[in-house]
Amino acid sequence: MAKGYRNTLFTSVKTPRVPLNRFDLSFDRIGTFKMGKLYPIICKEMLPGDRFRVRTDSLVRTMPLSSPAFGRLRMYIHYFFVPNRLVWSNWEDFITGGESGEDTHVPPYLPWNKLSSMDMLVRSNNDGSGNWTYKPEDGLVSAFGLPVQPYSGGNFADAAVLNGINTTAPVSALPFRGYRLIWNEYYRDQNVDDELEINASADGDLSSNYAESGSNWKAGLFGDLLSRRWLKDYFTSALPTPQRGPDVQLPIVGEGGTIQADGPLKLLIQNEGTGSTTTTSSVFAPDLNVGLGNTTGIGISSSVNDQFPVEKDHTDLMYASGLTTAGGSVVAATINDLRRAIALQRFYEISARAGSRYIETIMGHFHVRSSDARLQRPEYLGGGVTDINVGEVLQTSATDETSPQGNMAGRGFGIGRSNQCTYRAEEHGYLFGIMSIIPEPYYFQGIDKDWTRQSRVDYYWPSFAHLGEQEIDKSELCVGSSDIDADMYGKLFGYAPRYAEYKFSKNIITGLLRGSLGNWTFARRISDPNLNAALLEVPQVNNPFAVQDEDTDKFIVWFSNEIRALRPMPFFGTPSI
């Protein structure tokens, strides 16, 4: 009897070896950018077998500053690989031809004239008077390097074809979907941000998927640039709830009884002027009636005096005596029941701190960092950080009252190089390089917790070090706002780990930099301290810039993207048979 079947002739297929050749895909990119936005500075198609080595040199300058502002500005570059199958569910059938070899799916696209008209609508604004303004070419379409409609402010027409350009060339939707998927998986704060729709099942012409109106275009797949969130600190890492899940109840069970009353029912009345309370005599005294009024709530009248109206918000009915229980019983929980409740509470707390993404859940509970490819998400490849330094520009021309000699303005400048990343693609997809510029946060409107301790248990005690999450008061971030709430003290902002205030020091500003010299810092003023997307989103911090318009780009950056590629294709495309 044969020991094993060794004939592999019919169990394997010989595949041809594809030679690899080196190519230099390096290119420069020069553009203008905003603070806090996510820009795709690299978007390169990758093939199975490709080996890319990528890094980016950069030189960044700020637009003119009204002062040599203090604060840390940093430019971040992150590299990702996004497989096509994650952004188009029919990709595998399309690229293989399906089981029949005749699959008819068409890759998702938008005709260029529709895409450009949409970009025009996104960057347009009607102030209600019929006067339209048009933002610069800084949307997502332009950020990908695609051309947009040339436009002159004097001849705006809503959804019109401008300057006779009306090409219907199909523009692939896959890079746009990949950009949104990266934001969903890496930049979105799942505690406050909803996941953006990718609609990976849609293919072919997507024109009918989007209504031709500015708001719908802006919210759609091809809309505006997405925003970065502030780096995590005591406030920006706060949780909206102390745990991710329902409250865990102590496992104490029993049969419910009844409460019996055998005593006079009395009325507790509060005086609005003095704040004092008075308990009436028995409500059921002779000649005393209790009734409900249409507007005043509870009313009391007697044969002695007129009706006495009592506001509902300032009264309580109470029994003076005679309250007893009957028929009830309570059964104590077992030690195992208590253990289960404590373990479940701990489970919910870890889930809240770790995050709701699958990769975060595995890391939080099992301390295992799964690879991005295994979890079907964009793969993070690496990146780098560049500091942007701000220096002074001295006024050395003639002296006048508005700009005396020696007056200081500012200029920002930075040079950097990202870390080098190497990646071998095993399937079709896109290499992304995502750039963002964000300042380090500074705070000056709140009162730290150590200034408001009122009892000894407000201080640190080792016995309490492992209790659950503790509250962050709104007054720690903003003590009050004339626009929203004049007194934020005692109002919940979010939750942080126990005694986190002892382990963190926030950046602060003082003196005139809080007011008249506010243009000397990149600090932002917070008027509505609620834990939501608006608070965590990096805004356009315009304080130090000479031009305060939020629609004006504040940075000019030169990128030298160095990409060395080893690709499965001939170096020369010489015709042959």
PLM features per residue range, with description:
Residues 1-577:
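Intrinsically disordered, low-complexity segments
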